[in-house]
Regions:
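Extended alpha-helical targeting/anchoring segments
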Residues: 2-527
Length: 527
């Protein structure tokens, strides 16, 4: 999610110089920007919202409507990052129907309306490309959403993934136009209404500015409206998940993967299972429960329209980015190896030392660092790919990981989209080498993975990108929550331990569903 930097230094102008309640840019400045042939211009207004919360603002602005989202980030140790992003409205959603590009809503003129939906993502960002306005937050508009694991077949020669039990579009990217950006450093809330040049002409400039201002006014009115109390207690409702694979079936997958590794077909293979539970709760309440219990670097709630006229929700707390592009720099953070957090500081330190001393964990992590370097070398300038942080311990609320940081500078002609394609999917979700590992996974699992192992995040109008790996995530659709988790299999893996690892990885999201089902507003009585 935007800006994992916890620095509280004031942002540069024009953001920091905005007077409270003032609309920027003025019509005069807006006209100057429009005549520079910008396809998108953010019109903004800064208000004080130190008594509000991101969840409360999302509730007021989104009103459970499709095309809305909430993005947040908690750093190591649970410290919340500077910005929280509320998506209040999307002009349209770029998705896929029967394998082809499909728009829900009215996209601007000149955007692709047929063909490969992943290429449509690339071409939409290119068509709406607009230089960043200095001083505004890192995300003020763009394509926000999810790309499933199964989209990899559009970029790699991988066999068909078997049955599709979720009916999930491979691409679902919302064209986010109206946002509210929390700046936790000063308690301000920046309301953003993007004026999109829908017809690619210089006409109707004043009308476009007036429309954006009216949308700011509407958001301000919605924020000012009284809201019912959401103070609650939680009495979790136990759920017994069903799985895509029985325990013996999963352990047979592990043995098959080990046999393939011994035969030299792969170094590592990530096999997974999908857990499903009823989900009577609202997705926002699932997010609230997950936010409290498992804060992570990538927290997200997205309500996405489906081509069939319904909507589905994605609720997650992913610890891991696939790729982030800022300016011309691409950054990835391979994560492999884990231990639970200790019961005391000394115990925690002991577990960290044990993790770093585990030869199997170190070997797996080194393999993934090499894979990340190879991926970046496909799209970065020679000599710029570097491992700037190697095998550091990163601590989260319930778990610690070994994490490294690999960076590189994009070559001329390469975009953030190209960086996404080069690194997709994460080696931590496939294994290595990727193409053969993915082919084996398809044979073992027998199902399309859907969201699991894909990405959730954004490509903005200025050409930047931030994509989290879709793990520790619940897909809520048709009254059920689906949570998938995997284990990286190597030659000496123990089947029953790998099964238990998947159960443990799925636990946080499943607990959040149970907690949300048992959320009771103060004063309510269970029926």
């Amino acid at each position: 999610v935007p800006d994992s930097n916890t620095s509280l230094a004031p942002a540069p102008a024009p953001h920091a110089d905005l007077a409270w309640g003032r609309t920027w840019p003025s019509l005069e400045v807006f006209t100057e920007l429009a005549l520079e042939h910008r396809r998108v211009i953010p019109v903004v207004r800064r208000v004080l919202a130190d008594a509000e919360t991101p969840v409360g603002v999302y509730r007021k602005l989104a009103k459970d409507a499709p095309g809305t989202f909430l993005l947040e980030s908690a750093e190591h140790g649970g410290v919340w990052s500077r910005y929280s992003i509320v998506g209040a409205r999307s002009a349209a959603t770029l998705t896929e129907r029967e394998g082809q590009t499909h728009w829900i809503g009215e996209p601007p003129v000149g955007l692709p309306t047929e063909g490969d939906p992943t290429e449509a993502v690339r071409d939409t960002v290119a068509a709406l490309a607009t230089p960043r306005i200095p001083g505004l937050p890192p995300l003020t508009g763009g394509l926000v959403g999810a790309i499933t694991y199964d989209a990899v077949r559009r970029w790699e020669k991988v066999p068909d993934g078997g049955r599709d039990e979720l009916d999930l579009p491979e691409v679902a990217m919302m064209l986010a136009t109206d946002l509210a950006v929390f700046d936790h450093s000063d308690g301000s809330l920046l309301l953003v209404a993007n004026a999109v040049n829908h017809d690619a002409t210089d006409e109707h400039i004043e009308d476009a500015w007036a429309d954006a201002v009216s949308r700011l006014d509407r958001m301000a009115d919605e924020l000012a409206a009284p809201a019912p109390s959401t103070v609650a207690t939680i009495d979790p409702v136990p759920n017994e998940p069903t799985s895509s694979h029985t325990r013996p079936e999963f352990e047979e997958m592990v043995e098959a993967a080990k046999e393939a590794i011994r035969a030299g077909e792969a170094f590592q293979i990530v096999v997974s299972q999908r857990f499903t539970v009823p989900c009577p709760a609202d997705a926002l309440d699932v997010y609230r429960a997950l936010r409290v219990s498992n804060p992570s670097p990538y927290m997200y709630l997205l309500r996405i329209p489906h081509p069939d006229g319904t909507a589905y929700d994605i609720v997650g707390s992913s610890p891991e980015a696939l790729i982030k592009v800022t300016g011309r720099q691409a950054i990835t953070h391979p994560i492999a190896g884990s231990r639970p957090r200790g019961k005391s500081p000394d115990h925690d330190a002991h577990l960290a030392e044990e993790l770093l001393g585990d030869a199997k964990e170190r070997a797996e992590h080194l393999m993934l660092v090499d894979l990340a370097r190879n991926d970046l070398q496909r799209i970065c300038r020679a000599g710029t790919v570097d491992t700037v942080d190697f095998m550091s311990i990163r601590r989260y609320s319930h778990i610690m990981h070994i994490e490294s940081t690999v960076v590189g500078d994009l070559r001329d002609g390469q975009s953030a989209y190209d960086a996404l394609v080069a690194t997709f999917p994460a080696g931590t979700l496939s294994g290595a080498p990727k193409p053969r590992a993915m082919a084996l996974i398809d044979g073992y699992e027998g199902l399309r993975r859907g969201l699991y192992g894909g990405v959730v995040g954004y490509l903005d109008f200025a050409g930047d990108l931030d994509m989290a790996i879709a793990i520790r995530t619940a897909l809520i659709k048709d009254g059920r929550a689906h949570v998938q988790a995997g284990a990286g299999i190597v030659a000496d893996s123990v089947p029953h331990l790998e099964y238990e690892e998947t159960v443990n990885k799925a636990a946080a999201a499943l607990r959040a569903v149970a907690a949300a089902a048992g959320l009771r507003l103060l004063g309510d009585r269970p029926t």
